[in-house]
Amino acid sequence: WVTDITYIATDEGWLYLAGIKDLFNGELVGYALDTRMTQQLVMQALFRAVAAKRPGKGLLHHSDRGSQYCSQAYQKLLRQFGMQVSMSRKGNCWDNAPMESCWGSLKTELVHHRRFASREQAKREITEYIEIFYNRIRKQARLGHLSPAAFSQHYYAMQMAA
């Protein structure tokens, strides 16, 4: 998994979005939105990802070196979930390119075409983008031009047939 935080402008001020992407199928497996960029924000995204996917021990979790990800509480949580910690080299955004690409898609396809009057409006539209469009409909070249949901369905059908 890779993770990062981005921010979205609203008429009420910034809204922060922490997301976790599964590199296997390109799905955003967990995310959280809040008015502040805190360790609680990234922990909420992690709890949601773990609750949704129940990963096995040893899953590789990659982030940048932001204070939220380096916090003792977050690192402890990763250990409790049995995850292997990987962090970007200092000042090297290329290490987390898949997550940066995800944020670029979100902003190009949704955020830059909207003016959010409120944080609640932004939360609703971002949630719909992730849950309906990004994970279920949006095709990714890396996945053979399938959506994350279709790729997973195809993969597991092939596993059952083998």
Label every PLM stretch briefly:
Residues 1-162:
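Charged DNA-binding/catalytic regions of mobile-element recombinases
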